Amino acid sequence: MSSSAECRPIGWGGWGPDPNTSPTRAAIKWFADPRSLHHQQCACGLWNARRAMQWVIPAPPRIWIDDQPRMVKLAYILGAVTVFLTSGNAADVSPTSSVAASTTPSAADSLSSLGLSLPAGNVLVGNNETFTASSPYYEPLIDEAWSGNCRLNASCIVTPKSAQEVSLVIQVLSILDTKFSIRSGGHSSSPGFSSIGSNGVLVALERLNTLSISADRKTLTVGPGNRWEAVYQYLEQYNLTVLGGREPVVGVGGFVLGGGLSLFYNTNGLAIDTVTRFQVVTPNGTIVNATPTEHADLYKGLKGGLNNFGIIVEYDLTTNTGIDVWFEVKNYTRAETPALLAAYATYLQNADVRSNVEIQANPAYTVVLYGYLDHVSAPSAFNAFSTVPSVSTVYPPTNASLNEVLLEIGTAGVTGSSWTYTVSFSFKVTNPDFLQESYKTYLEAAASLLPSGVLLEYVPQGIIPNLVTKGQAQNGGNLLGLEATPQVWGEIFAQFPATVSQSTVASAVNDLLAKITSSAESQGVHLPYIFANDAGPDQQVLRGYGEDNLKYIATVAERYDPKGVMQKLQNDAYFVSKEL
């Protein structure tokens, strides 16, 4: 996909004029996650590739093959899938059940009966047509990955449409010792985490797009193949919402498993804490419902354990009736940003739990969203910021519905073919000092990278104690090991052209992270938590939860995946086996 030559990346994944020349217009994207998919429409006339895909790609095909000469034998093993689907479904039972035990030999025997001897990495499962790289299906599916450096050419792509098909896929990949990667929406900056190259199979979950609401309208069942845009649109008819992505085109799966900061995260807590049921396909093919009372150990493990246990094929999320919001968006100059951060520190000490302030800084200016969960006029919650002069108003004070805000303003921008890299860190906020210091350190690094075409952004996401205590009180709590104190979950986000090496950017960003971390430790404000949704590929997310929680995740992973399929065959992730 290509973007207009006039478009340049700005904060929160948006696009617009060069931020050095027009901060007001460039701030068209104010609150979205700082990584939005390139499948959107912008003022430059780019088409919505995601929507086009809904009719360009027909439902039946499930397999795409990149290297046709090397992978041509795949067509001859496809008959194996019918044995599983006709001999019985993997049931919702324990991993040691007779059903689970019987499904694996069936798939293995079927492959053996074909008389084929294929090397690991040269095998894919499925029951429909296969396509070469020249087909119209393969490249659009690869381009679903949001960041350019994550658009790896997998040997094959599988798009299962049911838990039973996912069960078969994971069994055969395991039997054949084939590397794989799992993709929900592909909104990652880490190559290999939801993508894979010619050494393996991409399991794309986009057809797992269930959306249904319970009779009492308190629970939404959602498949990981959905993007938040579809979820919000579905819920509009019920005047409800859920804790979902600030950018509507982000996929459901990775957002929820990573924790998930919604627009009013300090009011409602993390998305992961609103999950009442995970439907999981474990590596032996068993389909398990994990709830607070059923497979409770797995349920608890998934409240922070990411994709160490299996493939999540369905989520039950608690719905929310609080959809009336007030918001305003302003731009501030670089010179005023230290004063703005001082006001932010004051605000975080005693924030109104119905309010939200989101800040994103780039080298030229800083954009701020002020939001309040109700229809109000000039809420006093933001008085701390009243003395800091803004340079312009992007969106004037407005009352709207939360879904309207997310669907309309949240899709106002577009990203192109930029590559990205992110890291995450956290620190306590007791006064403005470290917030201002971290911003100054960031500016120095950003200035050194800008001449080479690298745009570095700093997103200090302020967290108040209510987010932590809300999570501890919901559905048995989580494993994140959070401290109930005012804090910041900082993100350093880099966008850069493919002409700049990722290793160069990663080295510079990691050096910046090391400086910020070292200074935070010396000042006694460092926190070990690393927010998974913003973390870098080399960070140890699970270790940041604390030793006890890390060991618990390892125990659950061993129980549900004794052969270590998710640790050994999954292409890349925050593996518990690497962090012990």
Swiss-Prot record:
KO phenotype (gene knockout): Loses the ability to produce yanuthone D, but accumulates yanuthone E.
Keywords, alphabetical: FAD, Flavoprotein, Oxidoreductase
Applications (biotechnology): Yanuthone D is an antibiotic against C.albicans, methicillin-resistant S.aureus (MRSA), and vancomycin-resistant Enterococcus.
Residue numbers spanned by region Disordered: 1-21
EC number assigned by the record: 1.-.-.-
InterPro entries: FAD-bd_PCMH, FAD-bd_PCMH-like_sf, FAD-bd_PCMH_sub2, FAD-linked_Oxidoreductase, Oxid_FAD_bind_N
MF (Gene Ontology): FAD binding; oxidoreductase activity
Pros-8alpha-FAD histidine, modified sites: H187
Domain FAD-binding PCMH-type: 150-322
Biological pathway: Secondary metabolite biosynthesis; terpenoid biosynthesis
Source species, domain of life: Eukaryota
Record has Oxidoreductase as a keyword: yes
GO biological process, one term: terpenoid biosynthetic process
Matching Pfam families: FAD_binding_4
Membrane-spanning intervals of the chain: none
Free-text function comment from the UniProt entry: FAD-dependent monooxygenase; part of the gene cluster that mediates the biosynthesis of yanuthone D, a fungal isoprenoid epoxycyclohexenone that acts as an antibiotic against fungi and bacteria. The first step of the pathway is the synthesis of 6-methylsalicylic acid (6-MSA) by the polyketide synthase yanA. 6-MSA is then converted to m-cresol by the decarboxylase yanB. The cytochrome P450 monooxygenase yanC then catalyzes the oxidation of m-cresol to toluquinol.
Family, as annotated: Belongs to the oxygen-dependent FAD-linked oxidoreductase family.
Name of the featured protein: FAD-dependent monooxygenase yanF
Source species of the chain: Aspergillus niger (strain ATCC 1015 / CBS 113.46 / FGSC A1144 / LSHB Ac4 / NCTC 3858a / NRRL 328 / USDA 3528.7)
